[in-house]
């Protein structure tokens, strides 16, 4: 199957590299940052001038872009070249309602559409060990599963279009609240003479053990906020969650608290940093 990949950011570049290395047929790529394209061309990908060219040449079009408006722009650009022979997979984390709208647009051309957002961050993307939540038909899911397996090892069909994104938003909302609990309690421990690594070791033996702390303790200890998943991206996701909760008539006070931390982090200019940098917001807060 000829594959097209649009969006070679922090995650997309690593995901696409695994496809290029494992797929027997051509892989066509496009990104507005030429350096990203050049990196994949060195691996064997074929550069395209725009998204339209990718979609025209590929059987399966994959997009991995930052926001809803970017997914919408790509779909609008490629619609004229979609047909029943093609399948469109948006792996971006966007508003589920927008994704459902885009799926309807794509399906009118005869092409199939699935949302397939990913969980975990850059190291897992590089290793081909992402989790992937899929929304779409069972037939479409089975068709794309071999390609998704190039990028991930825990791949679950959640239901119809949009359901993959709903699960992704629920996942990231939970991570944001676990993270905020780690931030608050580790800051309290530090205020009372217990460093982050000692705190993390102690937590690992009890019910509070969690993947976030296990994976980020050294970065926090070293104040190394090199980005694997940015504050800006999680800020987007927590607000998608709150919008979804509002539509669902569900109160989520824990997520509202996490959103306030992310809002403050964005105001302080931390947006490009890794999301573990939210610790800087929490540890500097004073009681009301």
Predicted features by range, described:
Residues 1-62, 82, 86, 122:
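NAD(P)+-binding Rossmann beta1-loop-alpha1 motif at the extreme N-terminus of oxidoreductases
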Residues 27, 47, 113-114, 155, ...:
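Hydrophobic beta-strand scaffold residues
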Residues 32-33, 67, 137:
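Residues in the short beta-alpha loop(s) of Rossmann-like NAD(P)-binding domains
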Residues 51-112:
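Rossmann-fold NAD(P) dinucleotide-binding segment
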């Amino acid at each position: 199957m000829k594959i097209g990949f649009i969006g070679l950011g922090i995650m997309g570049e690593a995901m696409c590299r695994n496809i290029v290395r494992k797929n027997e047929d051509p892989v066509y790529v496009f990104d507005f940052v030429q350096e990203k394209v050049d990196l994949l061309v060195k691996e064997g990908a074929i550069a395209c001038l725009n998204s339209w060219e990718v979609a025209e040449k590929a059987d399966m079009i994959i997009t991995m872009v930052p926001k809803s408006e970017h997914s919408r722009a790509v779909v609008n650009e490629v619609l004229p070249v979609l047909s029943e022979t093609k399948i469109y997979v948006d792996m971006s984390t966007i508003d589920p309602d927008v994704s459902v709208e885009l799926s309807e647009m794509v399906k009118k051309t005869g092409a199939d559409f699935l949302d397939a957002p990913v969980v975990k961050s850059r190291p897992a993307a590089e290793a081909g060990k992402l989790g992937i939540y899929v929304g779409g038909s069972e037939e479409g899911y089975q068709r794309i599963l071999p390609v998704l397996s190039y990028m991930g090892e825990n791949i679950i069909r959640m239901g119809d279009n949009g359901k993959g994104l709903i699960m992704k938003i629920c996942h990231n909302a939970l991570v944001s609240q676990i993270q905020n609990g780690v931030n608050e309690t580790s800051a309290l421990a530090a205020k009372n003479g217990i460093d982050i690594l000692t705190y993390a070791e102690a937590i690992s033996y009890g019910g509070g053990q969690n993947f976030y702390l296990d994976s980020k303790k050294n970065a926090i200890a070293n104040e190394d906020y090199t980005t694997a998943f940015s504050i800006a991206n999680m800020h987007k996701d927590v607000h998608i969650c709150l919008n979804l909760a509002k539509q669902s008539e569900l109160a989520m006070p824990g997520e509202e608290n996490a959103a306030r931390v992310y809002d403050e982090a964005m105001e302080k200019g931390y947006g490009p940093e890794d999301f573990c940098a939210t610790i800087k917001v929490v540890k500097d807060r004073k009681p009301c």
